[in-house]
């Protein structure tokens, strides 16, 4: 990774910090592993905004990532490391011995030419995917399944990982980077290692136009709006004189937002405790 701080030749370049990966493949992705991605602009089928601050952005094609690691006990060689516009981490193209190709998340430290594998009896090696019951305590993991066979859902963004803490009967306990301790079934799979491109957090876009290219629209403060648009709006000056609330009048800043009580029993310790 190379971190480049741009010279202040203009106000838009003054604060820009780029994270450059010199080993990224510069050609086109594999066409058979691409899908069309339709933008919604944060709207639902009625045309109403369901997610704010989304809209515009550069056109993207979705890279089909193999979160399940479908081909067991078939060695695969890492062909190249590629950029993926749909996620913060990079991806790698792997070629299986049976001739199949797949995209998977890039484990930190993987190199072109490395051999990786998935299955129940594969060794504990960077990039290998296997059931958590076969992995020793203290191992760093990523792309962890919540439900066996569904594919990895935990620790998939750039630089993220989880650590295996303990094993208890049919469940293991992992510690996430947020500090949360969570139970995972022993049959669920995980990949050895940490997700690559951990320097992604150091980048600074530097100007509003760069955010718009990523499809991020401006975030306007409630106190800067009119009373018709937000409970904090209107008045003389900037003081809104009440407890902070959302645009719909619900309390914010500290209010619990988790609703899925069914899976609450799998959380041993919450991240904020």
Curated annotation (Swiss-Prot):
SUPFAM superfamilies in the record: Nucleic acid-binding proteins, Translation proteins SH3-like domain
Basic residues biased stretches: 252-263
Disulfide pairs here are none
Swiss-Prot/TrEMBL GO biological process terms: cytoplasmic translation
Region Disordered: start-end pairs: 221-263
Sorted alphabetically, the Gene Ontology cellular component annotations on this record are: large ribosomal subunit
**InterPro entries according to UniProt:** NA-bd_OB-fold (IPR012340), Rib_uL2_dom2 (IPR014722), Ribosomal_uL2 (IPR002171), Ribosomal_uL2_bac/org-type (IPR005880), Ribosomal_uL2_C (IPR022669), Ribosomal_uL2_CS (IPR022671), Ribosomal_uL2_dom3 (IPR014726), Ribosomal_uL2_RNA-bd_dom (IPR022666)
Pfam families in UniProt: Ribosomal_L2 (PF00181), Ribosomal_L2_C (PF03947)
Q: Where are the transmembrane segments?
A: none
Q: Which domain of life is it from?
A: Bacteria
Single GO MF annotation: structural constituent of ribosome
Q: Does the keyword tRNA processing apply?
A: no
Keywords of the record, alphabetical order, are: Ribonucleoprotein, Ribosomal protein, RNA-binding, rRNA-binding
Q: How does it assemble?
A: Part of the 50S ribosomal subunit. Forms a bridge to the 30S subunit in the 70S ribosome.
Q: What does this chain do?
A: One of the primary rRNA binding proteins. Required for association of the 30S and 50S subunits to form the 70S ribosome, for tRNA binding and peptide bond formation. It has been suggested to have peptidyltransferase activity; this is somewhat controversial. Makes several contacts with the 16S rRNA in the 70S ribosome.
- Family as reported in the entry's similarity comment: Belongs to the universal ribosomal protein uL2 family.
From the Swiss-Prot or TrEMBL record, give the protein name: Large ribosomal subunit protein uL2
Supply the source organism for this entry.
Answer: Buchnera aphidicola subsp. Cinara cedri (strain Cc)
Q: What is the lineage of its organism?
A: Bacteria, Pseudomonadati, Pseudomonadota, Gammaproteobacteria, Enterobacterales
Q: Which gene encodes it?
A: rplB
């Amino acid at each position: 990774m190379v971190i480049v701080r741009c010279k202040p030749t203009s106000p838009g370049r003054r604060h820009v910090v780029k994270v450059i990966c010199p080993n990224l493949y510069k050609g086109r992705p594999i066409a058979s592993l691409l899908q069309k991605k339709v933008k919604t602009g944060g709207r639902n089928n009625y045309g109403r905004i369901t997610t704010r601050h989304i809209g515009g952005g550069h056109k993207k094609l979705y890279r089909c990532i193999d979160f399940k690691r479908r081909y067991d006990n078939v060695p695969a060689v890492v062909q190249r490391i590629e950029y993926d516009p749909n996620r913060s981490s990079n991806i790698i193209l792997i070629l299986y011995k049976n001739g199949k190709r797949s995209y998977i998340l890039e484990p930190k430290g993987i190199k072109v030419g490395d051999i990786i594998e998935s299955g129940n009896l594969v060794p504990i090696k960077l990039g290998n995917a296997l059931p958590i019951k076969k992995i020793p305590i203290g191992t760093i993991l990523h792309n962890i399944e919540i439900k066996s066979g569904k594919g990895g859902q935990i620790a998939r963004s750039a630089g993220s990982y989880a650590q295996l803490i303990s094993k208890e009967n049919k469940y293991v306990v992992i510690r996430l980077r947020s500090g949360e301790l969570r139970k995972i079934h022993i049959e669920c799979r995980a990949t050895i290692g940490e997700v690559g491109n951990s320097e992604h957090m150091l980048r600074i876009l530097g100007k509003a136009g760069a955010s718009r290219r990523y499809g991020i629209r401006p975030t306007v403060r409630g106190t800067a709006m009119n009373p018709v648009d937000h409970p904090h709006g209107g008045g003389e000056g900037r003081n809104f004189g009440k407890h902070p609330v959302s645009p719909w009048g619900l309390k914010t800043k500290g209010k619990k937002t988790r609703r899925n009580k069914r899976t609450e029993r799998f959380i041993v310790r919450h991240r904020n405790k």
